[in-house]
């Protein structure tokens, strides 16, 4: 047990976690030179294309120290984007320590602070690692001062390295052994194994990633979930190096994978505790905090006959991503689909891309919304909704509340003025301003609907990419909100409804219908596009008709003949307008995503 180390690698996005993981694997011989590739743990095509880690990945490697002792290192490479903070906290719960990787050029950023505080809350040993020291503009001394002042942790054991060149990797491995404590499990106790991840394999069924806290597990063992009756037989098990290596047993404090013939993806959840059927433990390990989505959107299959395939695909994605929420939804405009909950807009884009790539399902995605709280006049009853179509009539509402996010923005001092203007524009209220040498922390309370609406992109734009953001939900606050309905050819399109602050409603309504006008093709009749609040039209534009020249074959002749042809055309257009179907391109449903 004293020769095992379990740790996560945490950092802000793009600070070099995955490259550092590659170098640790290479140094310890997890893969040969021929098998090595950049970001070897980023297994999804999406991860490689975007250059980000989406799913946490675990690896077991062996290291022989300078003193000649062999150590087993189990580590998890985690995502750095704020949308995937849940993956980080889940990974930390399976470890005794964390490598806090910091870019020695960019320095401490928002997710550096947030991830470090998560590790501190879990009482993990933290080893700060300054990466990219090979770059000419690296500032290790300044970053060390920022670590002490901004994060508030000691830099006594700090490790300096370059994950790209491999400089300092041996010294880092030695510090991992010294700083991160060995686990305290007991191999003689009953089996207790925490399920830290799961995914579906079309040949093997459900695959579980577990961390064994006590006891051991071997092939043909009968196992069960504590608190449930179902019994499973272990068929295969092993570890990742990162290659999938089969073993006959997994021992106390090892991290590995298990296949036990589970075909029903609802049978087991991430965070549950596995034990043996005989000599079983009754004590559950600490359960993960249930994650609640921050935003919701409607997802509808482009082809109605793909509904069942779509449902099965969501089931399988949810097994691998427990933060994904979905429930059936029926739209008058788009038919049957699902209302899905996500951790943020990036998470939403990733799920959409995975559905299209991995399951070949084309989908229409409606604009994202947040959860609202309404207090009704009758009995002062509280209701919650995340779909604009569920917005109650104004005469029934006593008050409406919107979710508020606490935003921690870390920025170089020269961008403070522009960032404050952005926060005010987004209806933010300043709560604190903390100066640190050349950096400042701005703390604002901003409506969550404003945060998900291009706030991050605008923050990056006005700060030339140097400002960083961390945010979390803190509660609901009363606000003056209205629902904008969009009517196309006098028909309300429920999937285009939008909730916003009353002061912004005119401006937003005009922007939406102007964008829709540019996308919908012209028809052989006028197509009005209207925006309404309750039953009051607040803005309107028209798509002008296409006109066929019915007089082209009428050369000369009686003028009354021409009038008859024009009159006939007019009647035909009138009839077409009543019964005609407006073709609404898919891009229309994305317009509200981009109105800001």
From Swiss-Prot:
Q: Which UniProt keywords apply?
A: Cell membrane, GTP-binding, Hydrolase, Membrane, Nucleotide-binding, Protein biosynthesis
Catalyses:
GTP + H2O = GDP + phosphate + H(+)
Report the top EC class in one word: hydrolase
Q: Where in the cell is it found?
A: Cell membrane
Family matches, as InterPro entries: EF-4, EFG_III/V, EFG_V-like, EFTu-like_2, G_TR_CS, LepA_C_sf, LepA_CTD, LepA_IV
This entry's Enzyme Commission designation comes to 3.6.5.n1
Gene Ontology MF annotations: GTP binding; GTPase activity; guanosine tetraphosphate binding; ribosome binding; translation elongation factor activity
Q: One matching Pfam family, short form?
A: GTP_EFTU
Indicate yes or no for the key word Amino-acid biosynthesis.
Answer: no
- What topology does the record note for this protein and the membrane? Peripheral membrane protein
tr-type G domain location: 2-184
The entry marks the following residues as binding GTP, namely 14-19, 131-134
PROSITE patterns cross-referenced by the UniProt entry: G_TR_1, G_TR_2
Q: Name one GO cellular component term.
A: plasma membrane
Give any single GO term for biological process: positive regulation of translation
Q: Which Gene3D superfamilies match?
A: 3.30.70.240, Elongation factor 4, C-terminal domain, Elongation Factor G (Translational Gtpase), domain 3, P-loop containing nucleotide triphosphate hydrolases, Translation factors
Give the family per the record: Belongs to the TRAFAC class translation factor GTPase superfamily. Classic translation factor GTPase family. LepA subfamily.
Q: What does this protein do?
A: Required for accurate and efficient protein synthesis under certain stress conditions. May act as a fidelity factor of the translation reaction, by catalyzing a one-codon backward translocation of tRNAs on improperly translocated ribosomes. Back-translocation proceeds from a post-translocation (POST) complex to a pre-translocation (PRE) complex, thus giving elongation factor G a second chance to translocate the tRNAs correctly. Binds to ribosomes in a GTP-dependent manner.
Q: PANTHER family attached here?
A: TRANSLATION FACTOR GUF1 HOMOLOG, CHLOROPLASTIC, TRANSLATION FACTOR GUF1-RELATED
In Swiss-Prot or TrEMBL terms, this protein is called Elongation factor 4
Q: Give the organism the record lists.
A: Buchnera aphidicola subsp. Cinara cedri (strain Cc)
């Amino acid at each position: 047990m004293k020769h095992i180390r379990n740790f996560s690698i945490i950092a802000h996005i793009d600070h070099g976690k995955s490259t550092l993981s590659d170098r640790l694997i290479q140094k310890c011989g997890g893969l040969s030179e021929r098998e090595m590739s950049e970001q070897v743990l980023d297994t999804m095509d999406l991860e490689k294309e975007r250059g980000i880690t989406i799913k946490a990945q675990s690896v077991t490697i062996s290291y022989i120290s300078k003193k000649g002792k062999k150590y087993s290192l189990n580590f998890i490479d985690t995502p750095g984007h704020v949308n995937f903070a849940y993956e980080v906290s889940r990974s930390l719960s399976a470890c005794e320590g964390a490598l806090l990787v910091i870019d020695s050029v960019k320095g401490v950023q928002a997710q550096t602070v947030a991830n470090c505080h998560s590790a501190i809350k879990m009482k993990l040993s933290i080893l700060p690692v300054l990466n990219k020291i090979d770059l000419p503009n690296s500032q290790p001394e300044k970053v060390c001062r920022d670590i002490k002042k901004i994060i508030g942790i000691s830099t006594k054991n700090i490790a300096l390295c370059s994950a790209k060149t491999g400089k300092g990797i041996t010294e880092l491995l030695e510090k991992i052994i010294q700083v991160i404590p060995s686990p305290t499990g007991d191999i003689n106790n009953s089996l207790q194994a925490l399920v830290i991840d799961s995914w579906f394999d079309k040949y093997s069924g459900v695959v579980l990633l577990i961390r064994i806290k006590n006891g051991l597990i071997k092939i043909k063992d009968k196992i069960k979930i504590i608190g449930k009756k179902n019994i499973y037989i272990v068929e295969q098990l092993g570890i990742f190096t990162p290659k999938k290596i089969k073993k006959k047993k997994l021992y106390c404090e090892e991290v590995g994978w298990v296949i036990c013939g589970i075909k029903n993806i609802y049978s087991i959840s991430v965070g549950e505790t596995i034990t043996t059927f005989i000599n079983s433990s009754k004590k559950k390990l600490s359960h993960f905090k249930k994650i609640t989505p921050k935003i919701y959107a409607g997802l509808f299959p482009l082809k109605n006959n793909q509904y069942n395939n779509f449902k099965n695909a969501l089931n399988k994605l949810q097994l691998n991503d427990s933060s994904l929420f979905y429930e059936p939804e029926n739209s008058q405009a788009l038919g049957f689909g699902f209302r899905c909950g996500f951790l943020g807009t990036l998470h939403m884009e990733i799920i959409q891309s995975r559905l299209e790539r991995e399951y070949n399902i084309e989908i229409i995605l409606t604009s994202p919304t947040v959860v609202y709280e309404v207090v009704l006049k009758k009995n002062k009853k509280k209701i919650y909704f995340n779909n604009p179509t569920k917005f109650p009539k104004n005469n029934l509402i006593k008050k409406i509340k919107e979710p508020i996010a606490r935003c921690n923005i870390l920025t170089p001092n020269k961008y403070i003025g522009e960032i404050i203007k952005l926060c005010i524009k987004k209806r933010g209220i300043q709560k604190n301003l903390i100066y640190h040498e050349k950096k400042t922390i701005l703390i604002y309370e901003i409506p969550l609907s404003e945060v998900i609406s291009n706030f991050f992109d605008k923050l990056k734009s006005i700060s030339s990419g140097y400002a960083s953001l961390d945010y979390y939900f803190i509660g609901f606050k009363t606000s003056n909100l209205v629902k904008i309905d969009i009517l196309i050819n006098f028909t309300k399109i429920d999937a285009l409804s939008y909730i916003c602050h009353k002061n912004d409603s005119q401006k937003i309504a005009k922007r939406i219908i102007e964008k829709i006008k540019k996308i919908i093709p012209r028809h052989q009749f006028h197509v009005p596009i209207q925006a309404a609040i309750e039953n009051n039209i607040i803005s309107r534009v028209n798509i002008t008709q296409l006109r066929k020249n019915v007089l082209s074959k009428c050369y000369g002749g009686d003028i009354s003949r021409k009038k008859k042809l024009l009159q006939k055309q007019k009647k035909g257009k009138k009839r077409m307008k009543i019964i005609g179907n407006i073709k609404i391109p898919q891009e229309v449903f994305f317009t509200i995503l981009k109105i800001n």
